[in-house]
A protein has these predicted regions:
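A short, internal acetyl-CoA/4′-phosphopantetheine-binding micro-motif in the GNAT/acyltransferase core
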Residues: 75-86, 193, 297-306, 334
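Conserved, well-structured beta-alpha core segment at the onset of a catalytic domain
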Residues: 49-108
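C-terminal "cap" of GNAT-fold acetyltransferases
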Residues: 185, 189-192, 367-382
Length: 384
């Protein structure tokens, strides 16, 4: 039987998601309302009348020419990528009707992010690689991909070959490991079949010491409400100035709160660390099914010594665990192992949790209208 693709309602999409162990929060239908400047629709894949896959498509219209757009499925769609549930269906059986639909919608290019893991490295393997720099060994591994993985997926490699053969293209990652809109490398903690005590014991000595130091120093972590987003945002703006990135407006986070929690109360949580009656740090966490993501974080420079960031991560991990989550996701890392790289500190911080680094298949593009795609690429390049 042939697969067909058609628009489904947001409620149909949500019902599909409830039947899954998890999907990316970027594929929630309500996420489209957070993304200002994009149009959106939920697509369903059908075998006859049976819904067998779903995805959120965001359309970015060309300025002044709304009939043409870039179609984007962040960390999606949610389909049978590795032919597990439907072994008789090849990947092109799934993607061809999606491309036809997007072309009918006026898209000149489709960008997607298959949620398919390719390789994993345990924290101990990464630490061993980092140690080679400290010991000044000859030719220490500069990048994560230079280290032999503890696990790799043959099926994912096969999928990559299939996508290439069907005309999908992938932008090469730069030296930091970033070639996509969403991170290709992430750091995660497996919460399954472990007690909280065992998870805590899996942290390195520095992490455990910092969590205890925060508690002894009087750092108090609590859940915030919507009105507390203003406190989070004040610290977030300070963080942006320190780390040299452009901060999002408070209204973005208020919209994120309203949309995610409006559809599913408690999906987005705000965690606030207070020290001496002021906000020292704050974070946002998103949960979908059995997966929890650390989404945004902010911290003051003045209070860094009392380690509120470690305390916040531990608080989020505990909530994820008590909610039945199987994976706690600290999101993106660079693949650098060079201690002189300015992105190394973030890698080192996350490795201290004792989890694992995971590489995804990355984002892929399919050109539907080459002239429009080239013109849009030039426009984006000029914008910087």
């Amino acid at each position: 039987m042939k697969l067909t693709v058609r628009v489904i309602s947001a409620d149909q999409h949500r019902e599909w998601i409830t039947q899954r162990s998890s999907v990316s929060f970027l594929q929630l239908p309500e996420w489209s309302n957070v993304k200002v400047g994009w149009k959106a629709e939920s697509l369903g894949w059908f075998l006859g009348s049976e819904l067998v896959g779903a995805g959120l498509v965001l359309y970015r219209p060309v300025p002044k020419i709304p009939a043409r757009s870039l179609a984007y499925l962040p960390e999606g769609p949610d389909i049978d990528w590795l032919q597990q549930a439907h072994p008789d269906l090849a990947i092109n059986d799934w993607l061809a009707p999606m491309l036809a639909h997007c072309r009918e919608r006026g898209a000149f290019q489709v960008k997607m992010g298959p949620p398919v893991a390719t390789r994993r490295w345990k924290a101990d393997s990464i630490k061993d690689a980092m140690a080679k720099w400290r010991e000044e060994e000859a030719n220490p591994p500069a990048h994560l991909h230079d280290v032999i993985a503890d696990w790799h997926s043959v099926e994912a490699q096969h999928l990559s070959v299939q996508l290439n053969s069907r005309g999908w293209i992938q932008e090469t990652a730069n030296g930091a490991g970033f070639g996509d809109v969403q991170p290709r490398y992430v750091f995660q903690i497996d919460l399954r079949d472990r007690t909280l005590g065992e998870i805590f014991a899996g942290f390195n000595q520095l992490w455990r010491r910092n969590i205890r130091k925060a508690e002894k120093s009087g750092v108090v972590v609590s859940l915030g409400q919507r009105e507390d987003l203003a406190d989070f945002h004040r610290v977030y703006v300070q963080t942006a100035a320190r780390d040299l990135f452009t901060p999002r407006a408070l209204s973005y986070f208020e919209k994120m709160w309203d949309e995610l929690n409006g559809a599913y109360p408690g999906r987005l949580t705000l965690h606030i660390a207070r020290y001496q009656d002021h906000v020292a740090a704050a974070t946002l966490m998103v949960r979908v099914g059995t997966h929890a993501w650390y989404s945004y974080g902010a911290s003051t420079t003045a209070d860094r010594d009392v380690r509120p960031s470690n305390a916040l991560q531990w608080d989020m991990i505990q909530l994820a665990y008590s909610s039945g989550c199987q994976i706690y996701d600290l999101r993106g890392i660079a693949d650098t192992l060079n201690p002189d790289d300015h992105l190394f500190g973030l890698v080192q911080f996350k490795v201290g949790t004792g989890g694992f680094a995971q590489e995804y298949l990355g984002e892929w593009d399919y050109i539907l209208r080459s002239t429009w795609a080239k013109a849009y690429g030039l426009y984006q390049a000029r914008r910087g």
